[in-house]
Amino acid sequence: MKARQAYERALALINERDSGGAYHTDVADFEKNAPELINSIVTLLWVDECIVRNIAMREINWNFEPIRTLDDEIPLHEALASGVLPFALASFLILEEDSERADYFYRLYTNARSAVVSAFVSAEHGSVRDIY
């Protein structure tokens, strides 16, 4: 997924368009800051990336290529890039102007993160062995 797609989803979540469909004036600042915010979120989601891709954390390259522009690909599984990252980005974008809404989007992010990871984690059913 391109970073711009995640950015557009985040803007839609925080409703940054007026009734005529034009962006509000602070969107230019949002766009300038979005690549670095996305890189920070990718770092937060890197452990989840291992889980989703079923890769041992010791085997993954932790030095991912950071995005530089919104036209770059987000180096995450599609489920994380499209279903989780936009909520965190929405939260970070509006943190200074509306901390209550930012907190709401951060809770949505943590819920989405848990849901995606849970969908990829499988456990075998069986008895628990008493080791005492």
Residues covered by each model-derived region:
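Conserved short "hinge" loops at termini or chain/domain junctions
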Residues: 1-67, 103, 115-132
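Structural motif
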Residues: 73-82
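Short, hydrophobic/amphipathic alpha-helical patches that form generic packing surfaces
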Residues: 82-94
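Short helix-capping/linker segments at secondary-structure and domain boundaries
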Residues: 92-102
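Amphipathic alpha-helical scaffolding segments
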Residues: 104-111
